[in-house]
């Protein structure tokens, strides 16, 4: 039995010899051959029968027939082992093939996983995009929903006028929705060679003053489409505002500009400008003036240096510093100022933060709350990380409401009689205020509507009570509408922007304007605003770059002054000692009214 077992081991090794590669298996086969020669012969015979190395199958078959019963029994055992050897080889091949298949499947699975992840991400992104699109569509639909029934009806009002029971027909008609919805461009007033930054009607509404980047001021007879006079403002950089002083016989214009100067122009009855003189100087750009409704000689100015000047033309030194706007001992540059028409002691300012500040000239104490009477801000912007600036604010006709336009945000209406920190009352959406210091205004004798320009080049008019967009007009081919000035008595609107002309609008269309393309424009404005809000970090980089450039300019400026033979040039007393470069440095990187021509 032991020899049979040995022969079996030997046959198995020989049968697998071609597959074996380990030295231990080969040495075990040699030891089996040294143990018994008979077994070695049998093993060799079996190897011949397995491999066929003896030359042919006949010899193998003859020897197998001449053996005894024991050998035949051994042959049976050897045959069974031979068959076992064949099965083990096939099994190993199958295992090897299976392992290769598994490896290939694993590799395919590994290759497939990133593809599946990308597909899942794409599907999630598509899902998010579709959700955002649906949300945007719902938001746009809510902003352009059906309007409520108008309060003023044309036919009943005309009938009442015929019967003499409506003494204020024109007054009420100017504030009617039906007229606003029929606004159409009447004509343009061409005379400037730069962006038009300011518009202002005189008290009677017969003249319209405009100021531009070309440093000129033009007074228009807007009905005849002709300039009454035009003159050099005396400013050294972009003219931001030019206003007729009330009750002055249209003979005095107050102006302010990017160079920080506040100047006054004296107009003669012979339709010429006698002279202009400087009455105040800010250390930064001055964007807005605030007139007192009945005063021909006093007004306020605000600048990016955070200073508010009160200017009285009757004084030898007209300007006196009224207040420096601060937030926790930090100065807040100002873009806008407006006097309350119902209480001229109060005025509101806005600028490089999110707060509307109201002051009372009789109660300004900078040691107590920095002199502020009260502040308003939309509550979601109080602690917001996004830098919200107020580009323009205005009081309503009776001073009870205050409208503020925020850059890359919406327009908010506050009740001016509410207590400090009160929430807004109304919110007006759809436009975009980012590229320039954009204006906002009330329209109508009772401030029935809100009107604003937009970076998309359109003019938006909202009904104040419902917050719905009721008019939508293309107002500027250059792309941005900055200034909107309602006529004091008629249903007429003057607008200007990056284009070099002034546009006059009146309700002369035969039917209400179709708000074609409004939804697409609103969607585009919303997407652009959302995209910009994701890149707030870039704002810090731009501020840092501006700071470095500002520092280098200052060093270069001081170095030039230290050079021998370089000194200040004599300047006219009416001119500003600061150059436009200095104005640029003071102004900072946040907002500009319009790029210089």
Curated annotation (Swiss-Prot):
According to the UniProt entry, where does the motif Nuclear export signal sit in this chain? 39-50
Give the multimer and partner information.
Answer: Interacts with DDB1, CUL4A and CUL4B. Interacts with KPNA1, KPNB1 and XPO1.
The Acidic residues compositionally biased stretches are 100-112
Query: Could you tell me where this protein is found in the cell?
Result: Nucleus; Cytoplasm
What superkingdom heads the lineage? Eukaryota
Name the residue ranges with Basic and acidic residues bias: 65-99, 124-137
Quick one: a GO biological-process term for this protein? myotube cell development
The segments carrying the WD repeats are: 191-230, 234-275, 281-321, 329-369, 385-424, 432-472, 476-515
Cellular component terms, GO, for this chain's entry? Cul4-RING E3 ubiquitin ligase complex; cytoplasm; cytosol; mitochondrion; nucleoplasm; nucleus
According to UniProt, the name of this protein is DDB1- and CUL4-associated factor 8
- In this UniProt entry, the residues modified to Phosphoserine are 21-22, 99, 129-130
